[in-house]
Amino acid sequence: MSRIDDLQQDIESLLSEINSLEESREKLKAKIKDKRKNEESANPIVQEFEDLFDQFPQLNNFLFNEHPELEETDDKDISRAQADIPATPIPYEPKKRAKLENEEILPEQEWVLKTQPMVQHQMFDPGVADLLDTDILTSPSKRKRKLKIDDISTSDRSELEDYIVLENVYRMFGITFFPLVDPIDLKIKDASGEIFVDREMLGIRLEVFSERTSQFEKPHYVLLKKRIKSNSWFLFKHTIPSFIDVQGIFDDTNGGLVISHDDAYLFAKRVFLQLVEVQKRRQIFKDLEAKKIIHDLDLDLESSMVSFFVKDIKVELFVKQNEIVSCSILDDIHDFSQNNKSKWEIALLGSLDDLELKLNHSFATIFK
């Protein structure tokens, strides 16, 4: 018995030491947070994020901690939470709904809404997944109750506003995943009459922020479906402009074998960067027009073929990525020599970021 008592004392001593270390860790984290606030309090943008993190501490844990799912668990529940984690991952099985009575007399759109299974999502960290309630997608009563803002109580309205703010925070990063179900993939088991999803589907939302308007542009969407046999994703539908080779990017991601969520994110990131590149080119020319450096601006959808006027001189550019690779000056009014035209055309080639400076200096001598 003495050995058991010794072991029990050792365990209690270790637990006490662990608790002491955890308290020290929390104090250090608080000091670091206070120091960061003091150093960056002059920056209004940083202060806005700090206020947001204070309002949603789970978001702060999700972004800055390695294991946010354990931060919300008190000391007594840590060992229990770790013990509950299965040794092997549990395969995803969508919940089933019982077959409705008299469903044959329902309109098709109502039948789909009433019989589709609960939307499942596994794209978010477990620490915040419970905050993203998808019941509103499948429950008409909940959707009606949520959308009637005037009829809900103050506490419910505040809770709904918090959900909206949290969703907007995630969408700020430009790439978000969301769950959805294609009604075509809903099947009925002959024996039990239960509804199940034949294959998974994943939605990707891409939103590019415009610094010129301080707003997000119209979002683009990509829908992926899973192949039943190979369990890999394939490109189903998208709203990306045709000048971006979405299928080529998808086929080039991991050799065309997009299996995991990480693979899907890498594909989405490559498409997103091309959208950002197009928006950046458009923004540069729109800013030049707003500053009245150029006028009568004409852009194609890709913002690669560009024409504009500087005073009464027409300039045509061909832009690739962030570089001006071709320039033509078209003028029938001024008596320019071909040699001078060529010099000005060569001068405008190069980085798009230097275009404003070049226009101000290269063309200044023309109008003296």
Swiss-Prot record:
GO biological process, one term: attachment of spindle microtubules to kinetochore
InterPro entries in the cross-refs: CENP-O (IPR018464)
Coiled-coil intervals, chain numbering: 1-43
UniProt keyword annotations, A-Z: Cell cycle, Cell division, Centromere, Chromosome, Coiled coil, Kinetochore, Meiosis, Mitosis, Nucleus, Phosphoprotein
GO CC annotations on file: COMA complex; kinetochore
Compartment(s) where it occurs, according to its Swiss-Prot or TrEMBL record: Nucleus; Chromosome, Centromere, Kinetochore
Stretches that traverse the bilayer: none
Disulfide bonds: none
Chief localization: nucleus
Residue(s) carrying Phosphothreonine: T88
Assembly description: Component of the heterotetrameric kinetochore subcomplex COMA, which consists of AME1, CTF19, MCM21 and OKP1. The COMA subcomplex is part of a larger constitutive centromere-associated network (CCAN) (also known as central kinetochore CTF19 complex in yeast), which is composed of at least AME1, CHL4, CNN1, CTF3, CTF19, IML3, MCM16, MCM21, MCM22, MHF1, MHF2, MIF2, NKP1, NKP2, OKP1 and WIP1. COMA binds the centromeric nucleosome-binding protein MIF2, and to the outer kinetochore MIND subcomplex.
Function (record text): Component of the kinetochore, a multiprotein complex that assembles on centromeric DNA and attaches chromosomes to spindle microtubules, mediating chromosome segregation and sister chromatid segregation during meiosis and mitosis. Component of the inner kinetochore COMA complex, which connects centromere-associated proteins and the outer kinetochore. COMA interacts with other inner kinetochore proteins to form the inner kinetochore constitutive centromere-associated network (CCAN), which serves as a structural platform for outer kinetochore assembly.
Family: Belongs to the CENP-O/MCM21 family.
UniProt miscellaneous comment: Present with 952 molecules/cell in log phase SD medium.
Protein name from the UniProt record: Inner kinetochore subunit MCM21
Organism: Saccharomyces cerevisiae (strain ATCC 204508 / S288c) (Baker's yeast)
